[in-house]
Amino acid sequence: MTTSAPLSWLRPVPGSPGDSPHRAPGNTPDNPAGNTPGSTPDPLLIVVGGVPGAGKSTLLARIADDVPGSVVLDPDRYRRGFARRLPSWVPYAAYRWAVHTLHAAVTLLYLLRGPRSGAPLLVHDTATRERRRESLGLLARSRGWDPVLVAVDVSLDDALDGQLDRGRVVRPEEFVRHWERWTAQRSALADLDGGPRGPWSGVYLMARCDAFRPVRELARRRLPAGDPRR
């Protein structure tokens, strides 16, 4: 694969994207907050993070299909809506700001109004900006959600290939910033081993190829009691 010059100096992330973190006792993908049996947990918020091209939208689309009781917020939905309504010659770059502004506004609305049905809420976010990520978790917890972070782990080449496969490539300088923040945080996230950090009940580092099953089961188990889709 050929990459542009501004990306050539990016360093690889230490460690293997396929590493499976050890889970902290009592704090598993099925029980991120370590709730005791018989307790009623808060409705779950799952933030699916990762650099552009990590496969967040693909993972969320699979969850939406497989766990119909869940609520999934993904900017790709708004992108498709704009694309259907705009002339085909209008490039995505021309309305990308509108897509992400709308996604941010809808996400904020869902978090602020708090849980309504008890169904799990899954949100797309790069989650590479630490302050933004922590603010998101704090807001969610203050409004009655049980926030969990799932960071989708990919190699540099896989992230770049993922952007090419989807047909939307982030500007090189923007991707550089995402990747540098990711490399600075990855080891700390992996060391959490699924344990809590700040407002997050659980922080999980998952290889892209391994993420679907645990995230699906996590979402299913947090559907309201009696829901036949559990």
Report the location of each language-model feature:
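Glycine-rich phosphate-binding loop used to anchor ATP phosphates in small-molecule kinases
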Residues: 95-147
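Conserved GTP-binding G-domain of TRAFAC-class P-loop NTPases and closely related GTPase folds
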Residues: 37, 158-230
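Hydrophobic anchor at the beta1->P-loop junction of P-loop NTPases
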Residues: 48
